[in-house]
């Protein structure tokens, strides 16, 4: 409570640490000749400044007594010594210690009034020109403007970090914007979404039926829908959702569609008797994706006999023996600009890709391989013997925020290659596909490989399914389970699940087990025993490599509860391990964690065993997993070691982007492969507990699947082939392009 806060006042003697991104600062404040260590977020601070800070004293286990600053205000230096100290501190560029002394000697206690009201008089001092006098005055006034803006914004509950971003975006315009249309901030300022803007608007006194509020709310609903996988919403559904969110009558919502369309914030498409409404960004992503795929869909005239002769040479050299569908896939790859290869586990996708690679190598063609995630790319490299990268790295990510990634490879700087093969295509959303296609020159062959029966991408769109369903591009479906794969019950049962067939649960398998338990606590106890005692020896992997996959986030067997229990079991508290509490989560050194949103600006580096940086880049992505190496309370950072040794430093302000990953949702596991998976299973919502979800979970395991739970739920999931509909228009756009061609 504000009334319980203490106040201290003094000057900043020196700054120990400052994070320029979020304003977190550790400084020493001299108060009545006593030094106080102050810790907090400061919008703008410099050595020599006089401040009054409100907060409370705490005892840090390592650094001792500190004053935790909740708010502060700048105080004008009251005497000539304080004025000289401030001016000579470096806070004002161009004024050093000697010049500060001359200024104060000339103007004494009147110095700040002279700078603010009669800055030209500074030129009376030797070493200061009229131009320099104006520059000094500008700096002083800018700092004053920033402080006043901070006070203004904070009265509406805006924290210091966000207030700085807002001020940097609008400057002195912020006063008018906040009182007239705070919803502008949701468009312009990263970190201010509709919910934040709406809260500010409520405090400012904006009406709930304000035009600005309704338009911003409509855009927010479309953004939320994209998070659910939709690229558009039917008008009726959009109206209903927006009406519930805003608590405004539906007719008031519909009145604003045309204005938003005229401002090009949304795009409205009439398809038969339905109106589809897109956020403009997703409309153009779909349109561009359809256009560029159509442009790549060339036909190359290569005789059958020539292709077959080369395939035989490759088979003889490698010892591979292709079936008729695999041969067909190679032929289609040679003859077409775009090819889709799809099939379940053990159906020979890897053999087919390897043959295609060797075919084009014999022609001296340049080849690029990529996949959506680091794990998938690594697996692709291991199975082909050819370098594979993430799509982001192939496109040379240059940083940007979620939904606004920048790539060095684009229309102006395309990829220089003859063939691109993308694996795990079911994970690729419309945004990434759009960026990929922008960087591909016409004449380049593109092969898309994936399992269409897995869960769709986390991001918006149904890219792989729409491409296949359009029937515009040759698609080879591999269905034969090869001899080596047919000995694996993981693969055999995955295909049975996919076909809706009964799976034997007699546990006579060597890699697929079902342990029947019907109560959540008993399921959890068995899961703990498997991870800690039985599976590490059985599969020859560490307990950290065994992944718990669960259908839901909430509930008795949800991710949140399981992670708390698994953390206590696998990485309990220890005097040797530092912790950081963040909301309901306690992060601990040694914890397994996952990035839960794309952050294209986060920097990473790979270090040698001597600690030297041998590679670096930007971008950590939704689903990336790693281990917490270090928690640094002084710097307020957590360092995570991700796959491939990428070290990433998170400020405490970014911890919303991390969560524990001992257990993850099946959806989040897409594109990953683990030595062993454990799937705790009880009943859940019918739309979620379906065949598609179960199939995806089972196919994540390389050596062993163990399902612990209710066999009736397992059988119901196999029978349930219903899937939640995704609103995606790529198929229609492709067909429209075909008609126009």
Question: What role is predicted for each listed range?
Answer:
Residues 48-50, 590, 623:
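Loop/turn positions that initiate beta-strands
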Residues 615-618, 622-741:
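C-terminal accessory regions
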Residues 355, 359, 363-365, 374-383, ...:
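Conserved helicase motor core of SF1/SF2 NTP-dependent helicases
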Residues 452-618:
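Conserved helicase motor core of P-loop NTPases
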Residues 91, 124, 343, 371, ...:
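The Walker A (P-loop) glycine that initiates the GxxxxGKT/S ATP-binding motif of P-loop NTPases
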């Amino acid at each position: 409570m504000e009334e319980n806060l203490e106040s201290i006042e003094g000057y900043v003697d020196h700054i120990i640490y400052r994070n320029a991104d979020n304003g977190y600062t550790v400084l020493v404040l001299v108060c009545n000749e006593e030094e106080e260590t102050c810790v907090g977020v400061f919008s703008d601070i410099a050595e020599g400044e006089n401040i009054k800070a409100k907060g409370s004293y705490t005892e840090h286990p390592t650094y001792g007594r500190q004053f935790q600053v909740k708010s502060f205000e700048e105080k004008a230096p009251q005497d000539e010594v304080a004025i000289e100290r401030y001016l000579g501190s470096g806070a004002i560029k161009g004024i050093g210690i000697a010049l500060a002394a001359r200024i104060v000697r000339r103007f004494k206690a009147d110095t700040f009034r002279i700078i603010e009201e009669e800055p030209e008089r500074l030129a009376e001092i030797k070493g200061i020109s009229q131009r320099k006098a104006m520059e000094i005055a500008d700096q002083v006034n800018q700092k004053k403007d920033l402080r006043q803006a901070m006070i203004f914004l904070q009265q509406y509950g805006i924290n210091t970090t966000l207030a700085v971003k807002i001020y940097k975006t609008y400057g002195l315009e912020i006063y008018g914007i906040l009182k007239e249309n705070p919803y502008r901030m949701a468009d312009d300022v990263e970190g201010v979404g509709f919910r934040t803007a709406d809260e500010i608007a409520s405090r400012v006194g904006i009406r709930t039926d304000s035009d600005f509020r309704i338009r911003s709310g409509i855009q927010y609903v479309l953004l939320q829908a994209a998070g659910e996988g939709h690229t558009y919403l039917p008008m009726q559904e959009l109206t209903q959702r927006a009406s519930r969110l805003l608590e405004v009558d539906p007719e008031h919502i519909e009145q604003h569609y045309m204005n938003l369309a005229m401002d090009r914030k949304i795009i409205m498409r009439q398809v038969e008797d339905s109106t589809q409404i897109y956020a403009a960004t997703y409309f153009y992503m779909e349109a561009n994706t359809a256009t560029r795929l159509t442009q790549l869909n060339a036909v190359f005239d290569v005789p059958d006999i020539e292709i077959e002769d080369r395939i035989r040479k490759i088979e003889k050299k490698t010892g591979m023996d292709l079936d008729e569908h695999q041969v067909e896939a190679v032929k289609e790859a040679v003859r077409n600009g775009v090819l889709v290869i799809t099939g379940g586990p053990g159906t020979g996708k890897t053999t087919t890709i390897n043959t295609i690679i060797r075919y084009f190598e014999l022609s001296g063609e340049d080849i690029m391989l990529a996949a959506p995630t680091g794990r998938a790319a690594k697996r692709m490299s291991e199975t082909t013997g050819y370098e594979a990268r993430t799509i982001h790295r192939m496109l040379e990510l240059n940083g940007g925020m979620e939904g606004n990634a920048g790539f060095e490879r684009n229309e102006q700087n395309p990829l220089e290659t003859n063939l691109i093969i993308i694996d795990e295509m079911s994970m690729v959303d419309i945004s990434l596909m759009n960026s990929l296609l922008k960087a591909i020159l016409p004449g380049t062959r593109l092969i898309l490989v994936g399992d269409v029966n897995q869960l769709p991408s986390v991001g918006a769109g149904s890219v792989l399914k729409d491409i296949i369903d359009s029937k515009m591009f040759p698609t080879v479906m591999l269905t034969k389970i090869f001899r080596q794969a047919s000995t694996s019950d993981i693969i055999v049962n995955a295909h049975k699940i996919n076909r809706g067939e009964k799976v034997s649960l007699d546990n006579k398998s060597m890699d697929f087990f079902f342990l029947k338990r019907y109560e959540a606590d008993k399921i959890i106890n068995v899961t703990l025993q498997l991870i800690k005692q039985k599976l590490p020896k059985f599969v020859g992997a560490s307990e950290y490599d065994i992944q718990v996959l669960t259908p839901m986030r909430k509930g008795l067997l949800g991710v949140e509860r399981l992670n708390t229990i698994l953390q206590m079991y696998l990485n309990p508290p220890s005097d040797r391990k530092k912790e950081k509490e963040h909301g309901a989560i306690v992060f601990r050194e040694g914890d397994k964690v996952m990035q839960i949103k794309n952050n294209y600006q986060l920097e990473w580096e790979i270090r040698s065993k001597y600690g030297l940086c041998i590679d670096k880049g930007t971008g950590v992505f939704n689903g990336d997993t790693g281990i917490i190496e270090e928690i640094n309370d002084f710097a307020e950072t957590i360092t995570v070691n991700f796959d491939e040794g990428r070290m990433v430093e998170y400020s405490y302000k970014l911890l919303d982007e991390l969560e524990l990953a001992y257990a993850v949702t099946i959806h989040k596991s897409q594109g990953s492969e683990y030595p062993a998976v454990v799937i705790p299973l009880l009943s859940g919502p019918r739309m979620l507990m379906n065949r598609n979800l179960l199939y995806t979970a089972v196919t994540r395991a390389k050596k062993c699947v163990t399902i612990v739970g209710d066999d009736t739920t397992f059988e119901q999931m196999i029978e349930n082939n219903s899937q939640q509909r995704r609103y995606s228009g790529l198929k229609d756009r492709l067909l429209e392009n075909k008609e126009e061609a």
